[in-house]
Each structure stands twice: as C-alpha cells, then as structure tokens.
C-alpha cells in the first residue's frame, strides 16, 4: 500500500477504495452457532453462510470486484465459439503474464487436471516446493507421486525468513539424480505457498530452479494463482527488485516458467482459470483436453461475463495499491495477535493470517485434529469461519494410516478489499479470548470420512463435551452479547 503516516504514530492499514455496494451480515447467538457447527460435523466447510458473520474461509472467489470489472461484464460477447471476450482475455494474458497461448478452464483445479492428464505418466514424480490439496489429489489419481522440497527452515513457523516458499536447490538436484530425469514429469513452483502460511518464493530462487530444470531438460510449471501477492512481497523483501514495477516482477516470474496456470478466483478477483505458455508443442498436448473436460477453447466452461471480468482483473493485479491491501491487513492482524501472545506464522504471508494451531492447542493430540478443533471452537465463540490447514487436510497412506501434516494451522483468509478494520479488530478480540481459554478446547474424530478431499465433505464429532464448556465460559464472560 502507499505509505501514509498517522500523526500520533499509529500503524494501521489504510483502505484506498470506497464501499459502494454492500451485503448485510448476521451475527447469530452462540446457541445457534452451537447448533450450526454440530450440524456441520465440526467442519467449517459445511456451515451455511446464513450462520456465518465474517467468512474468512478462503479468498477463492470471494475477493471484491472493482467497478471496472462489473462494467466490463456488460460488454460480454456471448458466443459458444470465437467470442471477442476470449480475445480480450488472451490479450490481457499476453500483456500481464507474457504468454501467447491460452487455454481457459473453469477454475484452478481444472487446470491441474488438464496438466496432469497431458504430462504425468503413472509412476512418475512431480517435484514441487509444496503441494496444494487439489494438485496432490490429481497427481495421486493419475498414479503419480509428489516430492516436496522446501528448505528446512520453511516449516519453522515463527522466523524472519522472508522467502519460506523457496525450493531447496540441493534437494532438487539430488531428487532428479535419484529418480532419473526421465521419471520426473515436471517441476512445479507454487507462488505464495498456500499450505505453509501463504509464504512467497524469491526470484533468485526461481532462477536457480530454472537453471536446474534446463540442465536436466525438465519442464517448469508455475502455479500463479497468488502470483500478484508473491510479486508484491518480492518488491517488499528482495533487495534486487525493490525498484522494479509489479509488471516487471510478474513478467520475470512467468518468463522463467514453461507453463503457467492459475485460478482466476484468486489471481484476477473473478471466477475461472487458465493455462498459458509460449511453447506451441505444450499447448497442442493440452488442446483437446479442454473441450473434453471443460468446454470449447474460447470459453472453457467459464461464463463469458466472467471472462470479461477476468481480463480487467488481470490488469488490475499490476496496481500495487490494490494488490497490497490484503497483505497489509494480514500483517496488521498477525502483528497485533503476536502482541497478545497468540502464536502466529511469521513473517506474515498472503491469503490470510495463519494461527499456529499446534501450539495454540498443544494439549490436543495431532491425531485428534487440533487445527480442525480450533477452527470449530473459533467459529463457536465468534461467528468467524476460518479454514483448517492441518491433518484433516492431509490423507491416509495405502494402508489407511493417517499421514500427519507437517504443520497444524488455522487460516483466517483476508479476501481483497472485503473486511473493514473494525471487523478485523473484532476477529482479533475473539481470538484473544479463545487463546486465554484454550485449555477448554478438545479434540475431534471422524464419523464420516470420504476417501478423497475429506476436508471438504468429512464430518466429525467432538471427543468430549468441550464445546458446551466453552459456551458456558463465553456466556459467563460476555453475558448476553452476541
């Protein structure tokens, strides 16, 4: 954000936008919240928004759209094939991401499906800085496997390391030599690594990854869903790039990759997704898969109106005052929570503020899902919906044994230009109260566990009457307050 100093020295994020269309919210009583979270199987994904006050589940598809995006939707050229809206999007992709060939898809996981079908063979490995849930599911579904090669410090939750999303270059080369270059389907780098706290990689690291990829003739794929935020943090934290524009930084990152894919629900504050490249042979390997899985090549299963909004949103990603808004609010939340003793992932990343649930609920065994329990407890006492990013979001091995997550986090997402400062302060206040009463939180156990992506549809029971005890303490401290 553009720096604005306050007279009395306060350091608070300043919104450089005004609110013109609003949606009414409801803060229901804790008794209703108890019914809602129990009906949801203590899974915040299963909550209905009518029972949610602040929806901090995700930034995917929930970013505020600009007036220019909404206006662009009215010029949509509704055509099954050859829509002019597609060509406007194609130009935006070339202008912003520097890629000539575009395949539209309905969202990010659809891009993952197409890429996995085109380039991954059974038994091959995909090397990545860190997995994302849906990407891992697609790789496993195709009979592949993943190797995650973060640096050792990346999983130190509280540190000053500005680029925890970096790939360990020594581990990368060792992995290629161990597996054999022909058995590596591709190398994947995820911008603003989601599951470890929205942590970025540096351009220097991406250059090193590119060098190794070239040495062994392996394709480099970039998940650019959170590219704008990664570029912003590069500008803030990487000395060599502090004087460069957002456009310079984003183009440098995409130019280093053979293939770029993204969820427009994040990157451009719209809905949809895309795969783009400058290599025609890669485009042709994927081309037939888009009509098969998504829709014709000029709409890819996306509403034409959303294609128009996507094009405008891509250009707006280059606006530093827009892209910095969410990271600024996250930084404020993390720093204020830290002052209150609440364990948070540092340095502050993107997507959201990440609570270290493993430390917050260190009395809850990891096999009883401390991050999921914290998410349920936080909703119960606040009406705020966060997302579990821990062992519930993990998988079981081929023998049905739980694979414990590397970290147990509760993510409180900050979609772009959605929440106000007073709402942020409310979320902080309730989190502080819960931390002071954290020993009341207990564990969870599955009673319905789907075999794939269980964190979406799974349902759990509490392991004791801890939710009732938490509600009693809330009423004692807050009286009749919502």
Language model segments and positions:
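Short beta-strand-to-loop capping motifs
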Residues: 277-278, 355-358, 414-416
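Conserved PLP-enzyme active-site core in the AAT-like
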Residues: 2-42, 55-64, 69, 78-102, ...
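PLP-dependent enzyme catalytic core of the Aspartate aminotransferase-like
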Residues: 393-482
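Short, conserved charged micro-motifs
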Residues: 284, 362-370, 417-426
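Conserved small-domain helix->loop->beta segment predominantly found in fold-type I
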Residues: 298-309, 313-376, 380-406, 442-452, ...
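Short, solvent-exposed beta-strand edge segments and adjacent coil->beta transition regions
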Residues: 272, 350, 407-411
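C-terminal, active-site-flanking charged/polar segments
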Residues: 22-29, 66, 373-380, 432-434
């Amino acid at each position: 954000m553009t720096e604005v100093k306050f007279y009395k020295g306060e350091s608070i994020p300043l919104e450089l936008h005004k609110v013109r269309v609003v949606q009414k919210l409801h803060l229901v009583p804790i008794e209703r919240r108890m019914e809602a979270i129990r009906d949801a199987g203590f899974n915040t994904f299963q909550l209905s928004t009518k029972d949610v006050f602040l929806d901090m589940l995700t930034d995917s598809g929930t970013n505020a759209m600009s007036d220019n995006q909404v206006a662009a939707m009215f010029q949509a050229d509704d055509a099954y094939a050859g829509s002019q809206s597609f060509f406007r999007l194609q130009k935006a992709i070339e202008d912003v991401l520097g890629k000539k060939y575009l395949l539209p898809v309905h969202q990010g996981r659809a891009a993952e499906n197409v890429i996995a079908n085109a380039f991954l063979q059974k038994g091959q490995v995909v090397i990545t800085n860190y997995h994302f849930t849906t990407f891992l599911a697609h790789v496993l579904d195709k009979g592949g496997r993943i190797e995650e090669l973060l640096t050792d410090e990346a999983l130190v939750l509280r540190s000053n390391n500005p680029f925890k999303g970096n790939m360990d270059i020594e581990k990368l080369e060792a992995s290629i030599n161990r597996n054999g270059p022909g058995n590596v389907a591709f190398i994947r780098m995820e911008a603003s690594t989601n599951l470890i706290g929205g942590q970025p990689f540096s351009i220097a690291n991406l250059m090193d990854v590119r060098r190794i990829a070239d040495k062994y003739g392996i394709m480099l794929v970039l998940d650019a869903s959170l590219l704008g935020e990664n570029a912003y943090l590069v500008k803030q934290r990487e000395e060599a790039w502090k004087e460069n524009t957002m456009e310079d930084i984003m183009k440098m990152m995409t130019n280093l990759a053979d293939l770029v894919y993204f969820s427009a629900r994040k990157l451009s504050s719209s809905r949809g997704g895309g795969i783009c490249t400058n290599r025609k042979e890669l485009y042709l390997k994927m081309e037939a898969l888009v009509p098969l899985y998504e829709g014709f090549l000029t709409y890819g299963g996306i509403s034409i109106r959303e294609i128009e909004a996507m094009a405008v949103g891509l250009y707006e990603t280059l606006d530093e005052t827009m892209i910095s808004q969410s990271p600024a609010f996250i930084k404020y939340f993390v720093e204020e929570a830290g002052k209150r003793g609440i364990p948070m992932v540092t340095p502050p990343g993107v997507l959201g503020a990440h609570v270290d649930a493993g430390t917050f609920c260190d009395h809850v065994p990891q096999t009883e899902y401390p991050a999921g329990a914290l998410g349920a407890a936080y909703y119960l006492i606040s009406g705020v919906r966060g997302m579990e990013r821990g062992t519930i979001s993990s998988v079981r091995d081929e023998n049905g044994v739980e694979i414990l997550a590397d970290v147990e986090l509760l993510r409180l997402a900050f979609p772009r230009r959605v929440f106000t400062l007073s709402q942020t302060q409310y979320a902080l206040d309730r989190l502080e109260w819960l931390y002071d009463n954290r020993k009341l939180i207990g564990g969870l156990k599955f009673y319905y566990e789907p075999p794939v992506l269980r964190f979406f549809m799974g349902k759990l029971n509490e392991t004791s009457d801890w939710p009732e005890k938490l509600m009693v303490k809330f009423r004692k401290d807050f009286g009749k307050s919502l």
